[in-house]
Amino acid sequence: MSEFKCGLIAIVGRPNVGKSTLLNRLVGQKVSITSRKAQTTRHRVMGIHTTDEAQFVFVDTPGFQTRYTGTMNRAMNKRVRETLSDTDVVMMLVEAGRLKNEDRQVMELLPKDRPLILVVNKIDQVKDRAELMAYLQEVTAAHAFTEIVPVSAKQGHNLDELLKTLQAHLPENAPLFEADDVTDQTERQLAAELIREKVFRLCGEEIPYGVAVAIDKFEEEGNLRRIFATILVDRDTHKPIIIGKGGEKLKTISTQARLDMERAFDSKVYLEVWVKVKGGWADDVRMLRSLGLD
């Protein structure tokens, strides 16, 4: 009888390549925020998927930044490097048909002493098989990978094959978490991330990714969560964009975030959200530490 397998699996890749979407698909529910805006993932987020034979502990990482060099981005890049050094398997995500310089720069960081699984995402968007084969040849010439698995995170295509491939490379270990655990994030952390996701989705390109959410108060009373949060922006011009005419945009952000929280926490949620201008917060080490971003 085969032994139970369990290990840490890093999910790495350039910004906005689909890492958070893939993590949420593999786990079966939202544990990492997603949006069309690059750099929405700032924290290492563990997503956990357990079967009768194995436990997959996924560590999502920020997209490795090569364009921006501020304090926050340096801290996030440091976390990517730390994640690569303490996981059992590294899974790099690329976009089918598009090998960018940023992808090559991430490849340079990949360790040589553990299994490297290349996950080619968005294969549903490539209609020409010859084009896909040419792309795969380009990728394999750029770096040596242990395995290559094509998937569509958005459509859920070929994820069973990906899990099978990952399981083959996991070490034999007892499970690290309970069978029904799906993340190590606290409800407080997830609440902040869900609010930030709605800002990105509803404000589009009007707001840069320099937005943070601080949870000022989180109270539990039976089947009710009372959450008071502040959206931090670094420019005066961003505040009215998030608030919207007559406060309608902020109301929509709050409502959508609250509904997601109620689904995630399986409880009623009372949510109050404010917007505050805090210039230079992304370069303030003390502020980053208070937000868990140092």
Language-model region placement:
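Conserved G1/Walker A P-loop phosphate-binding module
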Residues: 1-78, 82-84
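Switch/connector loops and helix/strand junctions flanking conserved nucleotide-binding motifs
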Residues: 65-68, 100-101, 126-130, 157-161, ...
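Conserved glycine(s) of the Walker
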Residues: 18, 158, 249
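Residue-level signature of catalytic and energy-coupling elements of molecular machines
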Residues: 12, 16, 22, 45, ...
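P-loop NTP-binding site
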Residues: 187-294
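Canonical P-loop GTPase G-domain recognition
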Residues: 115-117, 124-183
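Conserved, well-folded catalytic cores of nucleic-acid-processing
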Residues: 29, 48, 52, 64, ...
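Conserved Switch II/interswitch segment of TRAFAC-class P-loop GTPases
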Residues: 84-104, 113-131, 154
